[in-house]
C-alpha cells in the first residue's frame, strides 16, 4: 500500500462533471489498495473572478485579506469533491490548510513578488 498524492488544477475540476470524473479516478486508486490525498485548485475561472472582486474593492489591499478571499475557491472545490466521493460510497473528508499539519521545508517567493 502506498500513499498517493493527486493534484488537480482548475480545468480538471472546472465543472460538476469533471469533479465526478476526478472522484472516479480517486476511487480507482483507493481500490488498488492505496491511501490517497487529493489537492485541488479552485474551479476554472474562479480565481480570476475573485481577483476581479478584490481589484474592484481595493487593488492595493492587505495581502492577508487577499489570501483569505482567494482560498475560498479551493474550499468550494474540496467540499464538492468530498461530496462526489461520498455519493459514490467512498469515505472522504475535506480539509483546509489550517486543519492539517504540513511541515514546509521550502517556501518559494509569493507570486505577488514576481
How would you label these PLM feature ranges?
Residues 1-108, 112-114:
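Nucleotide/pyrophosphate-binding catalytic subdomain
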Amino acid at each position: 500500500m502506498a500513499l498517493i498524492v493527486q493534484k488537480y488544477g482548475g480545468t480538471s475540476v472546472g465543472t460538476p462533471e469533471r469533479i465526478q470524473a476526478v472522484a472516479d479516478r480517486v476511487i480507482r486508486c483507493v481500490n488498488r489498495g492505496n491511501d490517497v490525498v487529493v489537492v485541488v485548485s479552485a474551479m476554472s475561472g474562479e480565481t480570476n473572478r475573485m481577483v476581479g472582486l478584490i481589484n474592484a474593492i481595493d487593488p492595493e489591499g492587505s495581502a492577508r485579506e487577499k489570501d483569505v478571499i482567494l482560498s475560498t475557491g479551493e474550499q468550494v472545490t474540496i467540499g464538492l469533491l468530498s461530496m462526489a466521493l461520498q455519493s459514490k460510497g467512498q469515505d472522504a473528508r475535506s480539509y483546509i490548510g489550517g486543519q492539517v499539519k504540513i511541515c514546509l521545508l521550502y517556501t518559494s517567493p509569493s507570486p505577488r513578488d514576481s
